[in-house]
Amino acid sequence: MSERKLFTSESVSEGHPDKIADQISDAILDAILAEDPEAHVAAETCVYTGSVHVFGEISTTAYIDINRVVRDTIAEIGYTEAEYGFSAESVGVHPSLVEQSGDIAQGVNEALESREGDTDDLSHIGAGDQGLMFGFAINETPELMPLPISLSHQLVRRLAELRKSGEISYLRPDAKSQVTVEYDEHDKPVRVDTVVISTQHDPEATNDQIRQDVIEKVIKAVIPADYLDDDTKFFINPTGRFVIGGPQGDSGLTGRKIIVDTYGGYSRHGGGAFSGKDATKVDRSASYAARYIAKNLVAAGLATKAEVQLAYAIGVAQPVSVRVDTFGTSTVPEAVLEAAVRQVFDLRPAGIIQMLDLKRPIYKQTAAYGHMGRTDIDLPWERLNKVDALVEAVKTVL
């Protein structure tokens, strides 16, 4: 009997409470970076019925209207009706932002290497905190992402498209998806076993109507027919009713969907969240760099899947460790890949910022539907412009 395995990942829509918080935090970050690219930002958001609290630490020369940024973000998501219990113009906005700690700033603004006499400009910035970050890539999809998270993101994005276009008029902003994929004995995806979709809706919509629309206009529009069969299970709004949703149904916080933001649990995670943080925070920038490395390694044919771990000490520019794990799929020893990675990629915070041009206001667009593997927007860590350099570096190491 051949061994078959199941793996499940989930995603949530832009109207999910935690994702509202992420988008507000990144909208604030973008607004600040648009005026002050050198700003240090750590903006956290909490949302609940009728209220938004924004708090954290910011050092900047910019002035932004946080109240307006918050309301505009909520309106763009689709919370514009009072009956939702959370609407752009009536919600209470409560900002409480202070300046970044001087003790932290001194290590970020002047790294240990710089204090010890290193005159390289890229050694000047130290990591904003200690920590470990992972990046991953696999050849299951054209964007080199695991199939379960890729499909999960596409499903909730499709729901949002149908809601905003008015094609399904009874949809409301909050939604979740979950996809279980069956893999064969060679770890290749062969079919979709289960799809779960819960979508907020107007009270007049019937369960039968929702089920039919979601299966025909969402699931079958997203998941290739080859992956669906008579045994595929669909659970559509399995509680039977989802009228109360968004922050009226659950409170939301920045940084509570870190697995949705990355690889759906298929790869390890260092625990740090992304949204609301400028690029001196390696939780964010080094995670992007690790994805950039892993994706280019797989695209170069050096492995069929790759996980890259980076780790840092606060106030120190150079990473304390770089590890490449290819799970036995690499064409050369992993030590060779690690050496090649160190040759090709400057993994000091300032090196990552320069390499990926991370001082720009590009972050709000990442705050829903995943930071990795995006095909709908142009993100620098998704580019395959280091393939040739990696192949050549491997040759020099060998």
UniProtKB/Swiss-Prot annotation:
Residue positions annotated to bind K(+) are E44
Q: Which domain of life is it from?
A: Bacteria
UniProt-annotated binding residues for ATP: H16, D174, A175, K176, R241, F242, D250, R256, K257, A273, K277
Q: What class of enzyme is it?
A: transferase
Q: Which UniProt keywords apply?
A: ATP-binding, Cytoplasm, Magnesium, Metal-binding, Nucleotide-binding, One-carbon metabolism, Potassium, Transferase
Q: Which family does it belong to?
A: Belongs to the AdoMet synthase family.
Return the PANTHER family for the record. S-ADENOSYLMETHIONINE SYNTHETASE
Q: What is this protein called?
A: S-adenosylmethionine synthase
Organism of this sequence: Streptococcus pyogenes serotype M5 (strain Manfredo)
